[in-house]
């Protein structure tokens, strides 16, 4: 019996639909048209879940169009320890660079937010979970020093799994280096606004993420040092529900305000105006 013509037409139609038109929300499982999601700043229109985004997309959302000028754009990581886990660290770097088209896990530069010039540092979770190695720490330190030298407000968007284990002590020393640079920036009267996105953990939380004069967080962002299972096994006590969420930390005074992604530009510009910078 010959196949009905409509079946062949339906199959042809399905094959003609390109990949990537739809995205499933990881929070509510709603399927959302990709262009609609991008127009909504990668926030789910159904449950308001703030999805993780690349540093480039964050810069496009945060800064005035066409104003971003990168600092130290060509700085790339090395492998001084010759570290090997499942594969050599240098291969892991190169694979991630090919996949992301980025040199490392942070973008730094200058730009304008509603007409106010700022220095920005934006971490990129798509590059090895936004982990902080020597390049991330050095680029952020130089950005902080640029803000100090030019008396500009500083905005750092944190989104990281913490220190990069493949760099061992070279990674851990970035906590002290960035914190020292921020102390000098503070002594010079600088304004530092930290924005904590999901997730902000480990050595990043233990250093520059929590040193802002003003600390904003995106809704429901995971913020903490160690994971809840590690903490529970260490202290052997039941932990409060949601104790590592932005909402819990706001109530405890560790976060100044939870800011929706759509309002972030406005809130940052208000703080800059209020500070007189």
Regions found by a protein language model. Give the residues of each.
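Cleft-lining beta-strand/loop regions that shape enzyme active-site pockets
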Residues: 104-186, 193
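Conserved catalytic cores of soluble enzyme domains
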Residues: 158-276
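N-terminal alpha-helical interaction blocks
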Residues: 1-13
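Long, charge-rich boundary regions
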Residues: 52-128
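Cys/His-rich microdomains that often coordinate metals
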Residues: 31-32, 50-51
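Short cysteine-rich clusters marking metal-coordination/redox-active sites
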Residues: 25-28, 44-47
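N-terminal targeting/trafficking signals and adjacent low-complexity tails
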Residues: 15-18
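Residues immediately within or flanking Cys/His clusters that coordinate Zn2+
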Residues: 22, 41
